[in-house]
């Protein structure tokens, strides 16, 4: 195993585009209110793992998937993660982590984030894509630090909605 630093170094050195498939999380979160069941994801997961071994990662957990599995689907989100890990052993599994909010809708104590990240890493998450809706890095810091105590990778993301190429853009620019 390369470890997080070795993984990041290898990624920076490669020339091929690294593709992340977000359909296991974002596609049905955005289009179907996250109502795709685990059994349906498991029907395609081994096929994808076999046909697309070069895929950089599969974002399959986090965001609303945790909450919806419990409240609306009557499923165990941890069982979903474990089964996807078994079905795609050759893929980097990725999750979306809401910084201090973890997978909830309100900030949690640091100890909760630490325990959640440790369990998610142990269950199969290789890459944690960490963000904060207000781009507050201080709100992302507990999650980043928690991931750094595991052998998983912390992929920190900033969110924006604007046109970087618009000459009138004053907030987000390429300068």
Tell me what each language-model feature is.
Residues 14-21:
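Transmembrane beta-strand segments of Gram-negative outer membrane beta-barrel proteins
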Residues 32-40:
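N-terminal phosphate-binding or glycine-rich loops at protein starts, especially the Walker A/P-loop
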């Amino acid at each position: 195993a390369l470890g997080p630093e070795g993984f990041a170094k290898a990624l920076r050195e490669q020339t091929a585009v690294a593709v992340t498939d977000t359909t296991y999380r974002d596609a049905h979160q955005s289009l179907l209110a996250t109502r795709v069941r685990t059994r349906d994801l498991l029907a395609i997961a081994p096929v994808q793992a076999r046909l697309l071994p070069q895929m950089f990662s599969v974002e399959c957990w986090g965001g609303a998937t945790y909450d919806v599995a419990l409240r609306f689907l009557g499923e165990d989100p941890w069982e979903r993660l474990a089964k996807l890990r078994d079905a795609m052993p050759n893929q980097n599994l990725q999750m979306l982590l809401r910084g201090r909010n973890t997978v909830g809708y309100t900030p949690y104590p640091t100890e909760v984030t630490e325990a959640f990240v440790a369990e998610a890493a142990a269950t199969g998450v290789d890459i944690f894509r960490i963000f904060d809706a207000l781009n507050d890095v201080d709100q992302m810091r507990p999650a980043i630090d928690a991931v750094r105590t595991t052998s998983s990778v912390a992929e920190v993301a900033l969110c924006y909605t604007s046109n970087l190429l618009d000459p009138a853009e004053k907030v987000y620019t390429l300068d």
